[in-house]
Amino acid sequence: MKISVVGGSIGGLTAGLLLRDAGHDVRVFERSPAELAQRGAGIGLLPETSRYLTECAGVDIDDISIATSHIRYLSQDNSILHEEKHNYRFSSWNTIYRQLLSCMKPNDYVLDHGMTGWSDVDATEVTVTFANGNTETSDVVVFADGVNSLARATLLPGANPRYAGYVAWRGMVHETELSAETRTLLADAITYFVYPNSHILVYPIPGLEGETAPGQRLFNFVWYRNYSTGGQLEDLLTDISGVQREVSLPPGAVAPHHIAEMQTHAKAHLPAAIAELIVKTQQPFIQVVFDLTIDQMAFGRTCLLGDAANLGRPHAAAGTAKAADDAWALTDALDRNDDLLTALREYENSQLAVGHQLIERTELIGRRSQFENSWVPGDPDLIFGLKAPGT
């Protein structure tokens, strides 16, 4: 079949590669005029995210990620409150994206193609229209167009992301810029600090060019802080040019007075090692935390994938994993079924269940950490994983 994938992020790339390898004629369309980049933002590398690279592309997992062997909690006085053995792998969005993109044929990944609409959803073909005037007609269209999905908004106009009540401040610092004491305390672990109505986590990730050797890595932080709507959130999301953003503020866009407040708060409330990381971050950025639950992913000859479908909070480190898992499930369903609509319905049933349980689990984690203050170090329900903690 001829298949168009709308959206060229990690989920769209994984879908395009798997469907191509299964024998389909696939093109991936990305709205950005240039290859994507997220300034090395860290991700927990769950098996679903790396599966294509390790199973199909022969990539060594050690070349794209950093292994840690402990979960560590700090007290405000910088001492270790709790520590347990647990193996994780961490990478960066850019590292995984670049590896997946290198597996694509250049003509199969098409930039500067932002979708504006499509037609003939229930007929024998689907024609997608792009902002540059081009069109593409396919047997199937996979919408992997992210949090602000035009496809979802069109197909399910009542399904809007719900603000969770807090945002994630993010940033990273090269390990050589940190003191030896801080590097030692943060080494070989994901490190947490939990305090009233907030928590922060720190972990090592590859360098900006994918370096994984000690001395060449970054330390990445994700700091969840509550902001109320009706003024506080809107002020935070107003960038240095006075434009109010809705979903995120990229590096370099956060207003200086908000960065100053964040650094002051860090020095007053966080352990010294984590505060050092915060203060030395050159360009912190912000991602708003949302939930979104939908009950349909297949629509005629089209389907939703990844964040264009169900959207969970980041507390399970499973955003990219869910998108990749959707891609594997879609490919498997098409392979098992001769009838397209049956295949898409099978995909929908499978991945709705995955998405719904993830949303329920991450909503509970967020509620416990940001509002109920019932987070307990060592609780196994807090372990990362897509389909269950630790999986």
Q: What are these regions, as identified by a protein language model?
A:
Residues 1, 21, 62, 252, ...:
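C-terminal helical "tail/cap" subdomain of flavin- and related membrane-associated enzymes
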Residues 2-28:
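N-terminal Rossmann-like FAD-binding beta1-loop-alpha1 element of flavoenzymes
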Residues 11, 34, 148:
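Conserved Rossmann-like nucleotide-cofactor binding loop
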Residues 59, 63, 79-80, 87, ...:
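Conserved FAD-binding catalytic core of PHBH/FMO-like flavoproteins
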